[in-house]
Design a protein with these regions (language model features):
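Pseudouridine synthases involved in rRNA/tRNA modification
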Residues: 1-23, 176-260
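RNA pseudouridine synthases
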Residues: 1-146, 152-155, 233, 240-255, ...
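Short beta-strand segments enriched for Tyr within beta-sheet-rich domains
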Residues: 91, 169-177
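A structural micro-motif recognizing beta-strand termini
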Residues: 107-109, 163-166
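Short histidine-centered loop motifs in beta-beta connectors
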Residues: 156, 161-164
Length: 260
């Protein structure tokens, strides 16, 4: 049987014997998962085990689930799933009222020497090769967006950064990283050549992608959620994904685990 590349055009199905290792927290109301960076959140045409929600339904045997916070396919890390509508509303309200602090870990191209706050509005880019791409814009349709980047480790080629999105726009971290001139490593859309995304969609992983991308997916990981509820704070953390961990071990001389 041909082995499927998890970061290829056609990702493999979820192995339910491995699924329990993704669980960060579970009780009768919540399921918090550390999603791998090759899996879509929403159900797809390829069956229940082709998506995170489908795998969760298989695991919990619940038909009704509430995806409180989702991630793009190639972003790893925390995904919050509520098992009851009332719990979903509680968490969604906290997000809407900005009673939550989110922290991501990102590997950026280039040496970001000091922390910076990016306060640049974001809009959909109407023209261009990649139709789903957003960009920094002062157009009237643009929405305000604020992201804070704090370097943890830096060498000549890469930076491991803590990233704090203070708003929740689509692709916000990636758009702001591109605007700064320090795109996320492995980003096919907001990296140095967006035609790589088209090639990936049409052909899967190719030699040209291998030559131009330092990772097979975007090096972005949702690391922490800290909620401020009336009945007390709640924090969830997801260990860094294995592929990003391996990249850091290879490219940074310092012990990056001491910096997180």
């Amino acid at each position: 049987m041909k082995k499927i590349d998890p970061f290829g055009k056609d990702a493999p199905l979820v192995d339910m014997t491995v699924f329990p290792s993704w669980i960060v927290f579970e009780d009768d109301a919540l399921l918090i998962l550390n999603k791998p960076g090759w899996l879509v959140c929403h159900p797809s045409k390829d069956g229940p085990l082709s998506s995170l929600v489908g795998a969760v339904r298989t695991y919990t045997k619940l038909d009704k689930l509430h995806l409180v916070a989702r991630l793009d396919r190639e972003t790893s890390g925390l995904v919050i799933i509520a098992k009851r509508p009332s719990v979903a509303r509680k968490f969604q309200m906290a997000i809407q009222e900005r009673k939550v602090e989110k922290e991501y870990l990102a590997i950026l191209e280039g040496a970001l020497e000091k922390g910076i706050e990016v306060n640049q509005s974001i809009a959909h880019r109407p023209n261009g090769l990649v139709k789903i791409k957003n960009h920094v814009s002062d157009d009237r349709t643009a929405k305000s967006a604020v992201t804070v980047f704090e370097p943890l480790l830096t060498d000549e080629a890469y930076t491991l950064a803590r990233v704090f999105p203070e708003t929740g726009r689509k692709h916000q971290i990636r758009v702001h990283a591109e605007w700064l001139g320090y795109p996320v490593v492995g980003d096919k859309i907001y990296g140095k050549d967006e035609s790589l995304y088209i090639e990936f969609i049409e052909k899967g992983w190719t030699d040209r992608l291998n030559e131009n991308l330092a990772m097979k997916r975007q090096a972005l990981h949702c690391y922490k959620y800290h909620f401020h509820f009336a009945d007390g704070p709640v924090t969830f953390e997801a260990p860094l994904a294995e592929d990003m961990d391996t990249f850091c071990q290879k490219n940074f001389k310092e012990d990056f685990s001491l910096s997180i």
